[in-house]
Amino acid sequence: MTSPRLHSAILLILVGTGVWAQEKPARYADRWVYVSRNLSKPEHVEEVRAIVATAGKHGLNGMLWSGGLEGIGRWDAKRLARLEAVKDACRQNQIEIIPILWSVGYGSGLGHDRNLAAGLPCTDVPFLVEGKEARIVADPELELKNGGFEEYKGHAMAGYRFHDGPGEVSFVDTDIFHGGKSSLRFENFAGTPHGHGRVMQEIAVKPQRQYRFSCWAKTEDLGPASAFRIQVYGPKAAIAPITVRMPATSDWQQISLTFSSSEFAKVKIYAGLWGGKTGKLWFDDFKVEEMALVNVLRRPGTPLTVTSDDGQTVYEEGKDYQPIADEHFNFRKPRLDCPAIKVTADSRIQDGQRLRVSYYYAMAINHGQVSVCMSEPELYEYWRKSAAGVKKHLNPEKWFLSMDEIRAGGSCAACKARNLTMGEILGDCITKQTEIIREARPGAKVYIWSDMLDPNHNAHGDYYLVDGDFAGSWEHIPKDLVIACWYFKKREESMRFFSGLGFETLAGAYYDADDLENVKGWIKTVDQTPKCRGIMYTSWQRKYKLLPAFGDLIR
């Protein structure tokens, strides 16, 4: 019979050697890392291997993988072999793969059919037939005054609502110009409260029309170059929120952007610097033109009509005029001219006749972002095929819907015919996505980004090019979704909101900082939120230096 002291010693030895030791229960069920690699290159495999090895070593158990996985069913043999290597690495490190896919906001399905893009309306655009072609009739009332910067008094330009600091920040330059004899130069940005160096003019437009603004710009040691912008505003917000890249030093370059006038009769065009610090910027030869049929969309939900000038006669495509398409369709760089309508030999349309053309077109914003239409049935057929591919090659238990930042929609005929709010359209879309996933993988757990469902974030009206209001979207989605909140500033309100509705949640933390203070703030909120499943290391810039410390912090 052993003594009590010896018995205690044996117990300590057994526990210390792991014979009776039990692992400490995990603090969170979901401990993930976000990874973006599409396996188009062999080196991507080694990069993912390194990340998941680090993740596994430091207690993480999931990889949210952005890698073009919605098209996995079309991958070639080499790419599928790389996929198997990644799957093997994840198994070795006990890392679960969670695919993220089907981004409405960032163009899911456009590679399959670009016509699935959200459509902006153009109504009753005038065309004139000359011979066997009809072309847009330029709006005689469209005018941008003093676009060549030739009319001025001192350093004040005529025709413009304002330009910052005439004689201090903005100057007439008769030595450097692109056309004519003068240009507008900006410098001395650091001497202004906000580093502004802008010029703005308000112009009259026709509602629901397509326009292009162009200008010539030149830079010298501009800093930061990212401060350069061209913006078109309606009464409340930007209607052409497009990011224009301009080198810090550059000779004259032409810059152009396409915009919709939406429902407005007047728009404000801004060009210049916001937050400039150093260098010089020149502008010359501003121009605005009405466009037509550029990036025209052809799908059931974006009908095109050609009528007589009085609207009484509707002409038939394929009979009175040849099928219409933009053969130079390009989201990022729309064509500079306008497609013509080709009149057929036996058409009812006569030479010299005026026509009215109504259609829908696609427009990219920011850095080329294009949203897709949630009301077009073909999109859901595409997702069904996509889900089958994901099931076949990954068969994941968890799926993640990339349904963030949906910045266009609600304006095409397909959306209007439903008589639903944008919140209802979004909720219906998410419900269908979830059903498609569970048809392919019964019992799957589905996660989703929070912002378009969160009144503290993007679930509201007046959102970019969206025609409608996302309010109430959270009332129309499956209650067993896991909501991934990522807005750090509103983390407490957001997590409390979804928890109060009975949803499970996940925290999207980190976001490429130089330390883990963001993560520490999230951990505090996570620990106070009922039904929160865990936290994710979310890097968009592929910064994984702090991943080990992150894993140790959430153990």
Residue locations for each model-derived region?
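Hydrophobic h-region of N-terminal signal peptides that target proteins for export
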Residues: 11-21
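Substrate-binding cleft of secreted/luminal carbohydrate-active enzymes
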Residues: 509-555
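Aromatic-lined carbohydrate-binding surfaces of glycoside hydrolases
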Residues: 30-141, 358-476, 481
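Small/polar beta-strand repeat architecture
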Residues: 345-365
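Extracellular and organelle-lumenal recognition/adhesion modules and their flexible linkers in secreted
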Residues: 129-345, 349-352
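Glycoside hydrolase catalytic-domain groove-lining segments
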Residues: 457-519
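Bacterial N-terminal signal peptides that target proteins for export
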Residues: 1-9
